[in-house]
Amino acid sequence: MQRSFRRFTFFCLLTASCFIFNASIQAEKPAKIVFISGKPSHGRMKHEHRAGNMILADALDRSGLDVETVLVPVLGYPEDLSVFENAATVVIFCTGHQGHVLNPHLAEFDALMKSGVGVVMIHWATEAEKGEPGQKFLEWMGGFCDLDWSVN
């Protein structure tokens, strides 16, 4: 009986040590925040998604927080998906509904969300079409802006 208690205690201490060691390793890495910008909409100097993301990324970089900001170099969904490696969260600032950058990439992005990456959608990026896009937004964020239903 005493021997099994020692084994159990050793196992518990070993398991706890692994969790603590893993947490300390993860804490050393800055939180990677990936910014996706949609194409400009509503005319010149209106809804400048990339400019907005640049301002937010710069503010985070200057904040002193332990973060690494990455602006996707193209407008729209990234061509090089390695940008998502080790991401803590993805910030999306784009036109919504039929013009949403995620519409053609729902399955890819869903896999990213299911891996534990967070998502922040800004302004019209919260607007999804009914059907699969809306369902995914519900899963990822708990809601979405629905045309003819949501009212500001």
Give the label of every model feature segment.
Residues 12-13, 52, 133:
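Alpha-helical structural motif
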Residues 27-87:
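Aromatic-Pro/Gly-enriched surface loop or interdomain linker
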Residues 9-22:
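Bacterial N-terminal signal peptides
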Residues 32-37, 68-71, 89-94, 113, ...:
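Structural recognition of the beta-strand scaffold that forms the well-ordered cores
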Residues 99-152:
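A glycine-rich, often tryptophan-bearing local segment used as a flexible ligand/cofactor-contacting loop or short
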Residues 42-43, 89-100:
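The substrate-binding groove and active-site-proximal loops of carbohydrate-active enzymes
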